[in-house]
């Protein structure tokens, strides 16, 4: 289950742009492409016998994001990684960079276009990374569970601290 909401923003998101600008980009942007840009994959053969004891960690980050006002386009590079460790040894490691490209409407603000691409692009490319890891680990004869889904928390209000009991 995902906590991603299809609701339009009711207030200005963080990043210095108005909710209306962001919503205009979100409702008009068209995905132009998702491309694998680079990959690094390695397995430590000494750890293969201990596969059931591997501890997995995952991560993602935005490497860059650029808006081209002339072409009305925005592009970002997202990096995803998964690492399996057996004790202190790295048993498996996969890092992949994906480029995500959107066409925006004429008049989109740079801040809104970049905010949209950073927010939405990470979810657009992640299924490709999950499939890549599944294919590579299968080809290597490794049985990993499916990578977890990622979910947006942008629309979830922050928790208020509880008062200490006296």
Language model segments and positions:
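N-terminal intrinsically disordered, cationic/polar leader segments
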Residues: 1-120, 131-166
């Amino acid at each position: 289950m995902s906590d991603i909401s299809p609701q339009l923003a009711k207030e200005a998101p963080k990043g210095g742009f108005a909710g209306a600008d962001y919503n205009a980009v979100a409702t008009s942007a068209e995905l132009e492409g998702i491309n694998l840009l680079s990959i690094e994959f390695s397995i430590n053969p000494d750890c293969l016998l201990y596969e059931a004891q591997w501890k997995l960690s995952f991560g993602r980050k935005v490497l860059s994001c650029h808006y081209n006002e002339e072409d009305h386009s925005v592009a970002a590079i997202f990096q995803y990684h998964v690492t399996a460790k057996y004790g202190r040894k790295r048993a498996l490691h996969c890092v992949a960079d994906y480029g995500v490209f959107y066409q925006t409407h004429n008049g989109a603000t740079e801040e809104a276009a970049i905010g949209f691409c950073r927010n939405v692009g990470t979810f657009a490319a992640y299924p490709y990374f999950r499939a890549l890891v599944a294919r590579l680990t299968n080809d290597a004869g490794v049985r990993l569970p499916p990578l977890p889904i990622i979910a947006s928390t942008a629309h979830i209000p922050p928790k208020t601290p509880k008062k200490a009991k006296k």
